[in-house]
Amino acid sequence: MPQLDTSTWFITITSMTITLFIMFQLKLSKHSYPSNPELKPINTSMHTTPWESKWTKIYSPLSLPQQ
């Protein structure tokens, strides 16, 4: 059974790591960031629903009187 030749693994892994690092740096350098990030005001509106104005009670089937 032949032995696995691992003599080129170090060069392969090193060159792959350097290439990925360079590609990532190039990708980040082309990204445009906002110059002055500010929070946008959020407009909240109150919605009135019919059940908000009156009291409601929810009956679960187990709390109903026995028949």
From Swiss-Prot:
Gene Ontology CC annotation, any one: mitochondrial membrane
Ranges annotated as spanning the membrane: 8-24
Membrane-topology descriptor: Single-pass membrane protein
Post-translational modification N6-succinyllysine, affected residues: K54
Signal peptide per UniProt: none
Biological process, per Gene Ontology: proton motive force-driven ATP synthesis
Record's keyword terms, sorted: Acetylation, ATP synthesis, CF(0), Hydrogen ion transport, Ion transport, Membrane, Mitochondrion, Transmembrane, Transmembrane helix, Transport
Main subcellular location of this protein, as a coarse class: mitochondrion
Superkingdom assignment: Eukaryota
Modified residues (N6-acetyllysine): K54, K57
GO terms, molecular function: proton transmembrane transporter activity
Compartment(s) where it occurs, according to its Swiss-Prot or TrEMBL record: Mitochondrion membrane
Purpose: Mitochondrial membrane ATP synthase (F(1)F(0) ATP synthase or Complex V) produces ATP from ADP in the presence of a proton gradient across the membrane which is generated by electron transport complexes of the respiratory chain. F-type ATPases consist of two structural domains, F(1) - containing the extramembraneous catalytic core and F(0) - containing the membrane proton channel, linked together by a central stalk and a peripheral stalk. During catalysis, ATP synthesis in the catalytic domain of F(1) is coupled via a rotary mechanism of the central stalk subunits to proton translocation.
Family: Belongs to the ATPase protein 8 family.
Quaternary data: F-type ATPases have 2 components, CF(1) - the catalytic core - and CF(0) - the membrane proton channel. Component of an ATP synthase complex composed of ATP5PB, ATP5MC1, ATP5F1E, ATP5PD, ATP5ME, ATP5PF, ATP5MF, MT-ATP6, MT-ATP8, ATP5F1A, ATP5F1B, ATP5F1D, ATP5F1C, ATP5PO, ATP5MG, ATP5MK and ATP5MJ. Interacts with PRICKLE3.
Protein name according to UniProt: ATP synthase protein 8
Lineage: Eukaryota, Metazoa, Chordata, Craniata, Vertebrata
